[in-house]
């Protein structure tokens, strides 16, 4: 059963590779943006230890910072996957960084957290020279990247989690978080029949936490609801849509936040508002009106937090 599930997972992400290549080839990137591509944040030569920087062309001086963690089920994608999305954010007047990180099964989720932190430490050292204002930082991610956004934010605020994940805290705080269609509950994906869903989740947990996952020291310290309690998290924006096949994950996150002390807002698309507002639509199809609206509202939320107007 486990081998069959692994083949299903791999086939799914192989299909995404082809679909995303077609999607990106069909799109015209946003204009008026300077891009620095493939900058190494580790000196080991690993192709996934690289990042991209984006800034609006012709604009000098420090700009508020957006850090984007791409999705892809923890086992697919790189810094180029969300390139057009990051360019759109930069075109609106922001300094944007998006990194590659090693994928499972090469590493567990701990290795991914380590890579994200390493890229952020690089930004702490080099961001100012590229015009990144690190007193105003929005951390955002979509799908699995949304999960990593919540996890990285928690690790940054918890010495115990820093020890577990073997990272050093950053010298700057996150001003706000934006979790887009986040798959933040890794213990139950809620996609198929209960039997198949349990099998899929079990195999993913082996990949993410190490086999056997039930004996992993990461168990109980990886989902948002594991790590968030008791931490002084910054304001959180949740982006959710009913046509999203992972909508149950967004519903669970929204319910959790509604019963928590964490300040948060929601951008929600109903099926009636847009039937094509599917999983991570605003990232994959940056030029749709729904996407522009969502991304502009995300940046408005960030601006509101930075002005101190969020309540």
List each model region and its residues.
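Alpha/beta-hydrolase superfamily serine-hydrolase fold, recognizing
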Residues: 1-311
């Amino acid at each position: 059963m486990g081998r069959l599930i692994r083949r299903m997972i791999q086939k799914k992400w192989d299909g995404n590779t082809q679909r995303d290549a077609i999607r990106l080839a069909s799109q015209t990137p946003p204009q008026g943006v300077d891009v620095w591509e493939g900058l190494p944040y580790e000196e080991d030569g690993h192709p996934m230890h690289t990042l991209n920087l984006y800034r609006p062309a012709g604009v000098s001086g420090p700009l508020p910072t957006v850090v984007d963690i791409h999705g892809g089920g923890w086992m697919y994608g790189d810094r180029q996957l969300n390139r057009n999305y990051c360019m759109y954010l930069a075109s609106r007047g922001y300094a944007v960084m998006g990194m590659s990180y090693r994928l499972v099964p090469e590493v567990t989720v701990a290795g991914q957290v380590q890579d994200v932190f390493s890229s952020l430490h690089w930004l702490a050292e080099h961001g100012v020279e590229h015009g990144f204002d690190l007193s105003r930082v929005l951390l955002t991610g979509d799908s699995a990247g949304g999960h990593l956004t919540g996890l990285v934010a928690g690790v940054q605020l918890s010495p115990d989690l820093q020890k577990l994940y073997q990272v050093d805290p950053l010298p700057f705080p996150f001003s706000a978080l934006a979790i887009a269609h986040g798959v933040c509950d890794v213990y139950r994906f809620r996609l198929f029949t209960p039997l198949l869903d349990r099998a899929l989740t079990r195999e993913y947990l082996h990949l993410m936490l190490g086999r056997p996952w039930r004996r992993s020291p990461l168990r109980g310290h990886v989902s948002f609801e594991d790590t968030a309690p008791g931490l002084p998290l910054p304001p959180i924006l949740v982006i959710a849509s009913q046509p999203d096949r992972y909508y149950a994950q967004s519903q669970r996150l929204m319910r959790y936040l509604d019963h928590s002390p964490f300040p948060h807002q929601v951008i929600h698309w109903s099926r009636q508002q847009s039937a094509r507002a599917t999983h991570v639509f605003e990232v994959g199809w940056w030029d749709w009106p729904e996407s522009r609206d969502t991304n502009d509202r995300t940046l408005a939320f960030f601006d509101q937090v930075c002005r101190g107007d969020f309540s």
